[in-house]
Each structure stands twice: as structure tokens, then as C-alpha cells.
Amino acid sequence: MINDILKDAENRMKKSLEVLADDLAKIRTGRAQPDLLAHVTIDYYGVETPITQAANITVLDARTLGITPWEKGLSSKIEKAILTSDLGLNPTNLGDSLRVPMPALNEERRKELVKLVKSETEAGRVSIRNIRRDANGDIKELLKEKEITEDQAKKAEDDIQKITDKMIAQADALAAKKEQDLMAV
């Protein structure tokens, strides 16, 4: 019972970390990264499809992405999707491929993005703490129903706290890496 609660809490915390990592990946740094375009979609035969599933995205240099669609007719759709996304990128259509230069970030924009990283990270921490609260509530419920002893409950709560501390440290590490990427000129 206790192991099930611990495993469930840890799995849910890992999912929260994955969501945080995805959210942080969407924040544009000055460097070219293919996963930046992962959430941009195009209409591909009537289905909203991520660009990553309709084209090959490569890093040409530190500030330029190359996009080679798997079908020639998709270049204009991909260009339009990137232009209408909230990324502030201007792709260049070369006919059978696209080039997407990454504009340099000014200091003010970098600071705004760092604030955004901090708020996303705090939301991730809150999510992890809520999972801890739920798990501790489940432990207290078992104790109330006399299915476990007080010592078992205390040990389980300590284990949940250790898992929580580990996950929050991972969230902080993700945020620190993203902030470092943002502040690098």
C-alpha cells in the first residue's frame, strides 16, 4: 500500500517535471534548437501535425535552423505556420527547404524570458508539492483507518519528502540551465 502511494507520487512528479521541461523548451534562447519548433503545427491532409513530423529540422549553425519538408508543397505551409507562431521568427523560403535565422535577444528581452522561466519553474514546484500533499493525505488516511502504524506513516512521509526534494532539485537544475542559456550572449 505504502509502496503504491510512493510509486504513484514519484511517477506523477516525474510527469510534472516532463511538462516543465516541455514548457521551458518552448522559451526561445538566442541559439538555434530544433525542439523550439516542436509545438508549431501545420494542416497536413486535414490533420494538425507538428512540423517535426512533416519535415527534417537541422541546426545549420549556432543561429540558424534548416527545415527540409518531406513533401515539396509543404514549404509554404511551414513558413506560414512559423510566421503565425508566437516565436517571433522570420523563415526564408528557398523553394524545397527553409532557413530560419534566430534573431539575437536584447538584454531587456532576456530578463523578461528569465522571469518567465522562473514563473514556469515555480508552477512546476507547486505541482510537485501538491502531489506530495496528496500522497501525505493518502498516508494519513491509511493511518486513520489503522491499516498502518504511526512509525510506518512517519517513514512514508519522510520518503515522500525525500522524493519531493529530489524532484524540486531537478526542476531547479532545469531552470538554471535554461537561465544560463538565455543569459549567454
From Swiss-Prot:
SUPFAM superfamilies: Ribosome recycling factor, RRF. Keywords: Cytoplasm, Protein biosynthesis. It comes from Francisella tularensis subsp. tularensis (strain SCHU S4 / Schu 4). The keyword Cytoplasm applies. Responsible for the release of ribosomes from messenger RNA at the termination of protein biosynthesis. May increase the efficiency of translation by recycling ribosomes from one round of translation to another. The lineage of its organism: Bacteria, Pseudomonadati, Pseudomonadota, Gammaproteobacteria, Thiotrichales. This is Ribosome-recycling factor. Gene3D superfamilies: 3.30.1360.40, Ribosome-recycling factor. GO terms for biological process: cytoplasmic translational termination. Transmembrane segments: none annotated. It is found in: Cytoplasm. InterPro entries: Ribosome_recyc_fac (IPR002661), Ribosome_recyc_fac_dom (IPR023584), RRF_sf (IPR036191). GO terms for cellular component: cytosol. Belongs to the RRF family. GO terms for molecular function: ribosomal large subunit binding. It comes from the Bacteria.
